[in-house]
């Protein structure tokens, strides 16, 4: 049983978030959520992917992450970029990028779950926009690696709790194509 099952945003907070970001009032029935607890993947890469897909439509996020899995398009790295290689990227102004394939696969599964939840609630999937995506550290799995001469080295495996919240927005507010917001903060 997962230890952390709570979303960081309640339905009321998600409604307020949609109003602040898009200036549109939606009801709690127009919001779909998906949660993936204790995934064995990199927390740093998960934060970057979650930050990147926020603001995209469900279709845009799925197509971009499928291209990441195929190693066609990268994810821009904003925070955890020390000593990272600079790549030829499809955008200008942000040369640090990675192809986190394992994280992209897990996010694709989560987005599939989100799409099914949206369909179950009766939402139009073409107008569903990701308004919140977050990756939080989960608990550590303690392991021991046997070494030579009777020694043992302890190492921990990090888990990640990922949540995605989407809302059905009016057609005039839904982004037609995704513009990369790569301005340095």
Swiss-Prot record:
SUPFAM superfamilies: Ribosomal protein L22 (SSF54843). This is Large ribosomal subunit protein uL22. GO terms for biological process: cytoplasmic translation. GO terms for molecular function: rRNA binding; structural constituent of ribosome. One of its GO terms (cellular component) is cytosolic large ribosomal subunit. InterPro entries: Ribosomal_uL22 (IPR001063), Ribosomal_uL22_euk/arc (IPR005721), Ribosomal_uL22_sf (IPR036394). Part of the 50S ribosomal subunit. Belongs to the universal ribosomal protein uL22 family. The keyword Ribosomal protein applies. This protein binds specifically to 23S rRNA. It makes multiple contacts with different domains of the 23S rRNA in the assembled 50S subunit and ribosome. It comes from the Archaea. The gene is rpl22. Keywords: Ribonucleoprotein, Ribosomal protein, RNA-binding, rRNA-binding. It comes from Pyrobaculum neutrophilum (strain DSM 2338 / JCM 9278 / NBRC 100436 / V24Sta) (Thermoproteus neutrophilus). The keyword rRNA-binding applies.
